[in-house]
């Protein structure tokens, strides 16, 4: 089975070694066929606390690290503008 990967934007970095990543997806509605946007929020492990709000990151599936955390940040693709 392949390891799942997602690309999303960090929306929260307030927890220690954990970030919340919002992954957006556009899919057709089952009945009407209109393209609608869906956003799913994943809690991901960030060992070095390197990610900040607004960063575009790649996450991959991992073993369960806590009750809700099953993803890990692999790399930061685009860092957010910070002063």
Swiss-Prot record:
<protein>
    <recommendedName>
        <fullName>Small ribosomal subunit protein uS17</fullName>
    </recommendedName>
</protein>
<dbReference type="Pfam" id="PF00366">
    <property type="entry name" value="Ribosomal_S17"/>
</dbReference>
<keyword id="KW-0699">rRNA-binding</keyword>
<dbReference type="InterPro" id="IPR019984">
    <property type="entry name" value="Ribosomal_uS17_bact/chlr"/>
</dbReference>
<dbReference type="GO" id="GO:0003735">
    <property type="term" value="F:structural constituent of ribosome"/>
</dbReference>
<keyword id="KW-0694">RNA-binding</keyword>
<keyword id="KW-0689">Ribosomal protein</keyword>
<comment type="subunit">
    <text>Part of the 30S ribosomal subunit.</text>
</comment>
<dbReference type="GO" id="GO:0006412">
    <property type="term" value="P:translation"/>
</dbReference>
<comment type="similarity">
    <text>Belongs to the universal ribosomal protein uS17 family.</text>
</comment>
<dbReference type="GO" id="GO:0022627">
    <property type="term" value="C:cytosolic small ribosomal subunit"/>
</dbReference>
<dbReference type="InterPro" id="IPR012340">
    <property type="entry name" value="NA-bd_OB-fold"/>
</dbReference>
<comment type="function">
    <text>One of the primary rRNA binding proteins, it binds specifically to the 5'-end of 16S ribosomal RNA.</text>
</comment>
<dbReference type="InterPro" id="IPR019979">
    <property type="entry name" value="Ribosomal_uS17_CS"/>
</dbReference>
<dbReference type="InterPro" id="IPR000266">
    <property type="entry name" value="Ribosomal_uS17"/>
</dbReference>
<dbReference type="GO" id="GO:0019843">
    <property type="term" value="F:rRNA binding"/>
</dbReference>
<keyword id="KW-0687">Ribonucleoprotein</keyword>
